[in-house]
Amino acid sequence: MKKLSFLFLFLFFYILGSIPTGLVIGKLTQQKDLRNKGSGNIGATNAFRVLGKKWGILVFLLDFCKGFVPLTIFLHFSEFWPTEPSTQTFLQPHLTMKISLLAISPILGHMFSLFNKFKGGKAIATSVGIITSFNPLIGISGIIFFAIFLRLFGYASLSSIMASTLVNIFLWLNYLYCDNFGTLVPIQNQIQKPELFYFSINFATLIIIAKHYSNILRLIKGTENKFNFKK
């Protein structure tokens, strides 16, 4: 039963992540297809650029929730946590893998949307939602660092890459040296080999950086568009 429940949750999280929020909002509010405007991306940054600040913020929040809400519900769903001491050693490695897979499923859904011919955004907001679901301190810090880098350098793509990298570094430092300070879920105390979970976040970050490949090339060539704060 639990195997079926997990499979259902994985598919549900993927489908939820697949909802092309920016595309839907663009068409509903301004009859604009983000795929044909600006950078062609359906994420929050292009929504800011094409639809304006108000709708860009809404797209960011909804994409954030695609990662934050489902994983938060799962992490506090007691059915999946081992309660009998005699079964903890057996169940914990499987639990670690379940959490790791569920953590990246909304990200994969956003990047490879079922409703957009398996194309999508770069999943920055969704990833931040996932991080925030178990450690709000690090998740919010990632948003703050993104804003700082964006103000300093003016490039949303560069700011996303730098902030994502810093968040991964903070996760490992917090795990190795700070006893998971700020973590709302007992990852270290109830799960064997929690490193698997952090490696899954690292893997997702590598995919995010790879999705910025064209942006990186433009940054190197000096042709990347700067973010317009005035719109």
Swiss-Prot record:
Enzyme Commission identifier(s): 2.3.1.275
Assembly information from the UniProt record: Probably interacts with PlsX.
Topology relative to the membrane: Multi-pass membrane protein
Record field: transmembrane: 6-26, 55-75, 95-115, 130-150, 152-172, 196-216
Entry keyword Electron transport: no
Keywords: Cell membrane, Lipid biosynthesis, Lipid metabolism, Membrane, Phospholipid biosynthesis, Phospholipid metabolism, Transferase, Transmembrane, Transmembrane helix
Domain of life from the UniProt record: Bacteria
Protein name as catalogued: Glycerol-3-phosphate acyltransferase
A GO molecular-function descriptor: acyl-phosphate glycerol-3-phosphate acyltransferase activity
Pathway assigned in UniProt: Lipid metabolism; phospholipid metabolism
Function recorded in the entry: Catalyzes the transfer of an acyl group from acyl-phosphate (acyl-PO(4)) to glycerol-3-phosphate (G3P) to form lysophosphatidic acid (LPA). This enzyme utilizes acyl-phosphate as fatty acyl donor, but not acyl-CoA or acyl-ACP.
BP terms from Gene Ontology: phospholipid biosynthetic process
Cross-referenced InterPro entries: G3P_acylTferase_PlsY
Catalytic activity: an acyl phosphate + sn-glycerol 3-phosphate = a 1-acyl-sn-glycero-3-phosphate + phosphate
Gene name for this UniProt entry: plsY
Species for this entry: Aster yellows witches'-broom phytoplasma (strain AYWB)
Keyword Zinc carried by entry: no
